[in-house]
Amino acid sequence: MKKKTSWPSIVIPCIIGLLSAGVYLFPFWIGVENRLYDFFLGLKSDVKEDSSIVLLDIDDVSIEKVGLYPWPRNTIAKGLEALTQLGAEFAVFDIEYIDKSPMSVDFTYLNGALKSEFAASFEEIGANVQDIFAALANNQITLPEAGIYGSELVDLIDQSRDTLYRHTKQVAIENDSYLGQAMRLFGSSFITVNMQDDPPSEGTEDLYAIAKERFVYPKLKVNAPLSDGRHSALVPIPEISRMAAGAGFTNVYIDSDGVRRRIRLTDNIGDTVFMQLAFSPLLKKLGAPEVVIDKNLVTLIGAVYDGKEENVSIPLDSSGMMLIRWPKKNYQNSFTHIPFYLLIDYAESGEKTASSLRLLRANQGWNLGPGYAPIDTCMQLWDESEELRRTALESGAVQDKEAWLTAVQTYWDTVKSFFETDYGTSVAHLFDEAKQAGNPEDAKLYDQVKADFGTLYANAATSYNRHTELETVLAGKLKDAFCIIGWSSTGTTDIGVNPFHSEYVNVGTHAAVANTILQRDFLQQAPVWVSALLAIAFSFGIIVVIRRFSTLVQIIAGVVLSVVVLIVNQLIFNVTGIYIFIISPVLALFVSFLTYSMVSFIISEREKSFLRKAFGTYLSGDVINEMIEDPSMLKLGGQKKWITAMFTDVKGFSTISQGFSMKKVSEL
């Protein structure tokens, strides 16, 4: 007899499958699914971090060393010049420069290099005056000769005056222009564009025109309709916008539960498309590939990875955003971090070295033997390098930049040779020899000048050693680096939540975006309809599998299969990076088997109760139990069976029993 399909095996999966497929219509379940996604992402192996990504932190230590933030823009410019010397490849500013800043005084230069220049110039003038009068007093020169020397001294004074005046003008800094020039000098500086939903403000047309001219990626192909996009943008001031190599928007998307899981790589104002802040310079780093935008995909055609051109497909979710492959570590422990103040320290230690050498040059000890040539060479090369730096800042020409960097390297090579010669020891011996050979009355003077020489030489050596120490440390980390600059001290409010940490400084978001694309370790969420179909399929499938088993086996099988589905989903996520929304399928599977098992149990118990009541008056309990175990026994016409009987009764019993009644036989 063919067994009929019971109504629960049809009705239950239909109802539960459809209900489970529709759970994503409710925001609550989307939030639960996001949390489950975070859990599965935590089980996935950690993403590899690209060593070229460096976060230049304006952190607590930097603020303590440099001063209250926000800093004058000339401070950032000085750090950018240091980055140029150290060979960094990109400087990405997560700092908005939408307002003009006042002019300021470069106190570092005023109290350092300029002060040293004044002291050295006047010491040199004073020493020359003293030498002329001493020579006259000792009848070493005649009055006419003194006149000649006097004329030369006047020329020296005029030259010093002009030089000091020119250098004094550098104390007043037009910070915005200086920062813009430093960005242009660096070459690959990228700034922010903040996309706005509000209409453009009056008078911003010129700034937006600069943005359209300079910040739109040229090799872009859009195959899908653009979204409604934004209505305006906050563009940095012209002094900076005209000098930066490019820009990108900083806007981020936050899920309903406050977690940043995804990012929009492109955004638009009308038909003008802008790139995300990290994505914009990254395209340049990857060889300026063609960018093709489709509905759920961004393709980089001809992107250069490890010297080879590749086509890289970046999957997007249903909203057109890329899932960020976040590192599991916290902000401080993810990627390479360098406090920004070290760049300032690097620049200032170089200036202090030059200032100390200039003071050392004014000491009379050089007259005792080596002459002024060794230190004069150093100072001449420093002045030349500074002049070339100013020229490069003003012109922005590549050849001027290279000339400056070459001059800087020549200067430091010369300074290295200067200190390797160890004039601190050799000149000290010359002082002792001159003291012994000279007038005893001058002994105290020799000791004083010798002590001054030693102090000045030690100061110069200390500054030089600090500079070379910083160069060794920084150059190893910053050579060809993709630097992201932002405020990360405890005073910042720019802190968000990612799938792993409740506090993650948002400067790191740009690092995570860049790293995701550099590693090509993309994540993808399958469309919701896939989960809906799986929910319906699992609802029917689980019942087909368990319907022939007992209730206990059904429960065990249902629980095991639910766990298996979760494990398989995790394996798929680990291997392919594709995450399938799993709540709906697992919910459908679990509720289907549980409901079916309960309904089947209730129906079974009801049938057993009916059989016991119907046949309990004229059938034994054992027979009823057999009927319950095998309901097919309940049919008309009986059963036809071939049965073999084996009699083992007492010999002759059959003959004897024939003479008794049935009752008597039963008693026997």
Regions found by a protein language model. Name each.
Residues K2-F431, D442, E471, A475-R547:
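Non-transmembrane functional regions of envelope-associated proteins
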Residues Y37-F39, S463-T468, N625-D630:
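Short gly/ser/thr-rich secondary-structure transition/capping motifs
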Residues Y178, V235, V273-S280, T509, ...:
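Generic recognition of stable, solvent-exposed alpha-helical segments in well-folded globular domains
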Residues E433-V473, K479, T490-T493:
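Non-transmembrane alpha-helical coiled-coil
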Residues I485, W642-S654:
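Active-site-flanking beta-strand signature of metal-NTP-handling nucleotidyl enzymes
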Residues G508, L523-V599:
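Transmembrane alpha-helical segments that form the functional core of multipass membrane systems
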Residues S584-K641, T655-G659, K664-E667:
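Regulatory cytosolic signal-relay segments
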